[in-house]
Amino acid sequence: MSKGTLFDKVWDLHTVKVLPSGQTQLFIGLHLIHEVTSPQAFAMLRDRNLQVMYPERTVATVDHIVPTENQARPFADPLAEAMMQELEKNTATNKIRFYNVGSGGQGIVHVIAPEQGLTQPGMTVACGDSHTSTHGAFGAIAFGIGTSQVRDVLASQTLALAKLKVRKIEVNGDLQPGVYAKDVILHIIRKLGVKGGVGYAYEYAGTTFEKMSMEERMTVCNMSIEGGARCGYVNPDSVTYDYLKDRPFAPKGEAWEKAIAWWDSLRSEADAEYDDVVTFDAADIAPTVTWGITPGQGIGVDESVPTPEMMAEDEQAIAAEAYKYMQLQPGQAIQGTKIDVCFIGSCTNGRLSDLQEAAKYAKGHHVAPGVKAFVVPGSEQVKQQAEAEGLDRIFTEAGFEWREPGCSMCLAMNPDKLEGNQISASSSNRNFKGRQGSATGRTLLMSPAMVVAAAVTGQVTDVRTLN
């Protein structure tokens, strides 16, 4: 078992007791909720006449179902409006902080908590959403949970969890131009597999991560779950502290200095013991594109769709399914694949730095004929900051639509959906069958910069060749 890692320290500090089942009852420092997985949890509390134990430790926003175009109330979708009203009622009744549409703080839950300074090193974080691992970028231990567990946290502020093993993933060296954090995590998942992290927490380390911004670290940690890991984290450092300083919920004054000293003490020890260690060279990572129906089916943009002979036997069945669904042939070059829709946004790549980098490539170009392209900021704050920098004008002049914040086309729970057999270039995190709203729609995952390259050429294109 691991010893001396940040994961072990944070786990031990939050252990209430070891249960007869062998699981640990873990105290949850920050609970994030949204409109999709919380209504049933609140209903279960009412059925049992239970109260929210620590409402000040729960924070809510609306993101999954919110339209990114017409946000007038009531929403056009009756189900979306009902979910919205339920969240408004539950947060008001239980005195829970709620970042509603128009508040200036609304957005995707995994974008707003960091930007408000709510997520901090050494915390345990839970949310009824798969990509809660995002918050591990701060040196927190963050878990995506189901609705019944949302109920448990509301009622007791604890979760019953089995302790994970810890795998250290080191990436060293400088990333090539045109290669981003999204490519790093897609490369890791490609190499370790979508089930490679089952039973593990991933500790991301090495010089590549040391040089990453907080928003880049969030992109990597966000997709830990796509590699099977329950959570992923980066040890806190000066980059973390510079990001957090002066944010609304960050410690202030003398408390700030004390917080840094404590956060530093949580870092994994130099002689920490890990259950597994894997290393990668940043120079080996290229702009990466998924070709199949899992995030692990990725290749460098200059590669071809792999043939069955190139795969392990246990990968061949899902590959055969992917060839058929994606309408791609083994050995076919991924470059040149026609694209219908381009989406920049999501909790993976909807932050300000993502939009800044994408805008660099969009400037001076125009979306290709027949391509629908749109940009969805991850939060109202991101949208405001981007507009202050003129990024919205760069995108609209290039033929992109500029939308309101929300989860948008990452998932099919709002009006932003693929139609029929369309194929999308998407900066989101999942390329499952039907994920973007059409039973036959197809998704290629890539970085925001690569999405721009696809948008302006109408096909999968190596962003490094874009003038």
From Swiss-Prot:
Gene3D superfamilies: Aconitase, domain 3
Cofactor field: [4Fe-4S] cluster
Cofactor remark from the record: Binds 1 [4Fe-4S] cluster per subunit.
Catalysed reaction, written as an equation: (2R,3S)-3-isopropylmalate = (2S)-2-isopropylmalate
PROSITE patterns reported in the protein's UniProt record: ACONITASE_1, ACONITASE_2
Domain of life: Bacteria
Enzyme kind, highest EC tier: lyase
Keyword Protein transport included in the entry's annotation: no
Family the entry assigns: Belongs to the aconitase/IPM isomerase family. LeuC type 1 subfamily.
Annotated function: Catalyzes the isomerization between 2-isopropylmalate and 3-isopropylmalate, via the formation of 2-isopropylmaleate.
Designated name of the protein: 3-isopropylmalate dehydratase large subunit
Gene of this entry: leuC
